[in-house]
Amino acid sequence: MDVLEIMKIIPHRYPLLLVDKILEMELGKRIVGLKNVSVNEPFFQGHFPGYPLMPGVLMLEAMAQVGGILMIKSLGLEIGKYAVVFAGIDEARFKRPVYPGDQLIMELETISLKKTISKMKGTATVNNQVVAEAILMAAARELESIKK
């Protein structure tokens, strides 16, 4: 699945769209996504000048976006009508830095998936080395319901 298809499913846009491609997907079970980490990412301007590292919270957000795609597709939710929002994060660990030029591969495996709530185990790797992992909980909400 390419980025244009991804943008039909989740509402995230630049500079917070953090998934470029879906490589694999088994509905209700697992998904694998890819983020090409460019030196031009806006977060590198301040994290850290001269020593660019991808912030850990953005690795979690990237995993969550990939998991959100799996959730929306698996539950058969109407495309373009829902956003998946964080409900919780457990056991987050950051193992290695992510640099400009890296390809961040994110694999999410479903632990539970019910109605509009999910729990997934996420693992992010670069060059087959784990850089981050976490248990992510999320809720699907109609976009209209999250407006102020």
From Swiss-Prot:
InterPro entries referenced in this protein's UniProt entry, alphabetically: FabA_FabZ (IPR013114), FabZ (IPR010084), HotDog_dom_sf (IPR029069)
Chain's role: Involved in unsaturated fatty acids biosynthesis. Catalyzes the dehydration of short chain beta-hydroxyacyl-ACPs and long chain saturated and unsaturated beta-hydroxyacyl-ACPs.
Gene giving rise to this polypeptide: fabZ
Family of this protein: Belongs to the thioester dehydratase family. FabZ subfamily.
Record's keyword annotation contains Lyase: yes
Matching NCBIfam families: fabZ, PRK00006.1
Keyword Chloroplast belongs to the record: no
Localization: Cytoplasm
Superkingdom of source: Bacteria
BP GO annotations: fatty acid biosynthetic process; lipid A biosynthetic process
Enzyme class per UniProt: lyase
Keywords: Cytoplasm, Lipid A biosynthesis, Lipid biosynthesis, Lipid metabolism, Lyase
Name this protein carries in UniProt: 3-hydroxyacyl-[acyl-carrier-protein] dehydratase FabZ
Substrates-to-products reaction catalysed: a (3R)-hydroxyacyl-[ACP] = a (2E)-enoyl-[ACP] + H2O
Active site as annotated: 47
GO CC, alphabetical: cytoplasm; membrane
Any GO MF annotation of the entry: (3R)-hydroxyacyl-[acyl-carrier-protein] dehydratase activity
E.C. no: 4.2.1.59
Organism whose genome encodes this protein: Hydrogenobaculum sp. (strain Y04AAS1)
